[in-house]
A protein has these predicted regions:
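Conserved non-catalytic scaffold segment of RNase H-like nuclease domains
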Residues: 1-109
Length: 109
C-alpha cells in the first residue's frame, strides 16, 4: 500500500475560503501514523445555519483559532512527499486552493 494523507475541510459558510476546520490522517506502510485536527478562524468569519447543522461548529468554537496560514505552516511539513486524498476531493481541493489564493500563498504541488 502506498503512503498518503487523507484530508477533510469543513467550511463556515458557502465560500470555499471559509475553512473552519481541517482533519488529516497520515498513512504510511498501511498504518495510520498521525491524526491531525485543527480549528481555523474562517475568512469570511461568519457561520450559516446550514453549515453548522452539518458539522456542529459555530463562531464561538473558532473565534480564538489561528488563521489558515498559521495552521498550514504546522501541517505542511507533515505532508511533504505524500499524495493527498479526500472523500469529496473537488470540494476539499477547492477549499485548499481558495485559501492559498486568499492569503497569497503558493499552492502545493
Amino acid at each position: 500500500m502506498k503512503d498518503f494523507a487523507a484530508i477533510d475541510f469543513e467550511t463556515a459558510n458557502g465560500k470555499r475560503t471559509s475553512v473552519c476546520s481541517v482533519g488529516i490522517v497520515i498513512v504510511k506502510g498501511g498504518r495510520i501514523v498521525n491524526k491531525i485536527y485543527r480549528l481555523i478562524r474562517p475568512a469570511p468569519n461568519y457561520y450559516t445555519q446550514w453549515t453548522t447543522a452539518i458539522h456542529g461548529l459555530t463562531y464561538d468554537d473558532t473565534m480564538e483559532a489561528d488563521d489558515f496560514p498559521e495552521v498550514w505552516a504546522e501541517i505542511k511539513p507533515l505532508l511533504e512527499g505524500l499524495p493527498l486524498v479526500a472523500h469529496n476531493s473537488p470540494f476539499d481541493e477547492g477549499c485548499l486552493r481558495a485559501v492559498h489564493e486568499l492569503y497569497g500563498m503558493t499552492y502545493p504541488n
